[in-house]
Structures are given as structure tokens and as C-alpha cells.
């Protein structure tokens, strides 16, 4: 409970994992959306609650049967506005001024440092197992795209692994 304020949407995911996930069979598709972001049958502008009811995804499309999980399209975090970089990324700039103009260094780690706190992601990575830590650090330093919003649809068997790994990691942080 003391960490709840830091978990945001994950508070519900934790509750679901602890209280509901076990009631589903391993092949059942389970999906999570986010406030004002929903899984839709097709790309369409939602203008009313009626539009949402008509277009919200209620069962997985057949083409998903060849997948284990489905996640949102990635978003790019490179090329932050220069003023934002100066205001929020100044610690990163002091450490490495080339971040200001080198797009390869405008990565996920920089984005996280700017928006969630400098060094927090590095400290969180330190409590990971060695192999995962190395892969994670490489990913956040080498990439400028990630899949946002904690939105995904997956079968129970994969959600169980995801939640176990995720919350074990978060409890160590």
C-alpha cells in the first residue's frame, strides 16, 4: 500500500492479478485499456458514447490467434523540444552535452529521466537479474520508441508470467 501512489494504473493490474486472474483458463484472452484509450474494432474517431459502444472490441479478431499477446503501436520519444530538454533534461545535458543535438542519444532513458525523475530508471534496473538488467539497459539506451499506456491483450498464461515478473521487480525497487 505504501507504493500505491507510484503504481498509477498498475494498482488495478495488481488487484486483478491477485484477485481475478486465477478464475480464467490459460487460453482466455484478457485485455486492458486505459482512461480515454480503448481497443477498437477499427481505426475510427469516437465522437460519442454510442460510437464507443458500437466500435469497442469485445472479442479478439481471428488474426490474433497466431499471436500470444497484442500491444499498442509504439510511440517515438526522440527530438524533444529544445526548451523542454533544457528545463527537464539539464542533468542529462550536464553529463553529456551532445544529447542536445545527437538524435541517437535522445532515447527512452532520457525521456524517462525528463518526465519521471533523473536516475530513477537506472536505480530500478539495478535490482533486476543480471541478464535482464543488461538487456533492459541496452534497450532503453539504444531505442527511442516504446509501447505506451499499459494497454495489451494477452492470454492468461502470459499475463501470469508478466504480472509475476513485473510486480516482483517493482517490490524490489
Residue ranges and their predicted role:
Residues 1-173:
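ER/Golgi luminal nucleotide-sugar-dependent glycosyltransferases, focusing on the catalytic module
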